[in-house]
């Protein structure tokens, strides 16, 4: 599986998921009046205030 791994500050790239990972995630939150979006392989639990979307494809 290949997921985008945009971390907001380095631009959009992609990565091949390791260890048989079958999901990608996108999480977003607001920090110091700026919206932060992070994408990568996996789908984990997040803390309150963070929006998480998980998918099988990009």
From Swiss-Prot:
It comes from the Eukaryota. Gene3D superfamilies: CD59 (2.10.60.10). Expressed by the venom gland. GO terms for molecular function: acetylcholine receptor inhibitor activity; ion channel regulator activity; toxin activity. The keyword Flavoprotein does not apply. GO terms for cellular component: extracellular region. CDD domains: TFP_snake_toxin. The keyword Membrane does not apply. Belongs to the three-finger toxin family. Short-chain subfamily. Type I alpha-neurotoxin sub-subfamily. This is Weak neurotoxin D2B. It comes from Micrurus pyrrhocryptus (Coral snake). The lineage of its organism: Eukaryota, Metazoa, Chordata, Craniata, Vertebrata.
């Amino acid at each position: 599986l290949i997921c985008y791994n945009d971390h907001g500050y380095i631009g959009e790239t992609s990565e091949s998921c390791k260890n048989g990972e079958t999901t990608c995630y996108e999480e977003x939150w607001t920090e110091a009046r700026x919206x932060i979006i992070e994408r990568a392989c996996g789908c984990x639990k997040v803390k309150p205030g963070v929006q998480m979307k998980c998918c099988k494809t990009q």
